[in-house]
Amino acid sequence: MKVVVIGGTGLIGSKVVAALTEHGHEAVAASPSTGVDTLTGEGLAEALAGASVVVDVTNSPSFADDAVLDFFRRSTEQQLKAESEAGVAHHVALSVVGTDRLQAIGYFRAKQTQEDMIRESGVPFSIVRATQFFEFAQGLADSATQDGTVVAAPIKIQPIFSGDVATAVARTAVGTPVNGIVEVAGPDTFAFEDFLRKGLAVQGDPRPVVTEPQGLYWGAALQESDLLAGPDASIGATSLAEWSARQT
């Protein structure tokens, strides 16, 4: 089976390509570095020739509200158009657990737009929503830092190893389209403060972390469970402790 992985040279995409190849599939990594530009459509038709499945794990280079919306809207439009013309039978997109609950944040409004376009396209699809990755701890801390202190929102988080996300995406890609959402999450739930502290420790980052009762997540007030997966989510195999031990 030929599977084209859009964003196939990045953190998740490279792992998806490796997992598919390991199981005997023809996995094609498509990205600007391989001559495929989903914003203009350049190289898409050639990459999709003979493909059964397209996996989209791209992300916007800018998280500014207008820029991220423009990225996902244009990229998704170009992909779906090319897929319809090529006869692709399954579109798989990576999204984020809680997207529908996080609409006060521009990034998640853009992801919701992406999901809606996929649903309305007529192309059979599966949307894989993942929780935040272990690897994102430092970036999340950066977004919450005030005067050298990380000010965490009073929420819970169920982070996951990027490799387990890639495994779930690859498994979904070679399965039957669900025409809906599947969720994947890590095995443990943490207070956001605790996760950030553990993640920073792995990087040798000494910033103090505190929880502020009125603390915001990307500028928005959340309910405690907004970032948690539902009861039917697939659970990744790798714990934060196991992943952390591998980094030292």
Labelled PLM ranges:
Residues 1-24:
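N-terminal Rossmann NAD(P)H-binding glycine-rich loop of SDR-like oxidoreductase domains
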Residues 87-90, 95, 113-136:
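Conserved beta-loop-beta element that borders a ligand/cofactor-binding pocket
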Residues 125-126, 139-160, 164:
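A conserved pocket-lining segment of Rossmann-fold NAD(P)-dependent short-chain dehydrogenase/reductase
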Residues 189, 196-248:
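Mobile cap/lid helix-loop segments that border enzyme active or cofactor-binding sites
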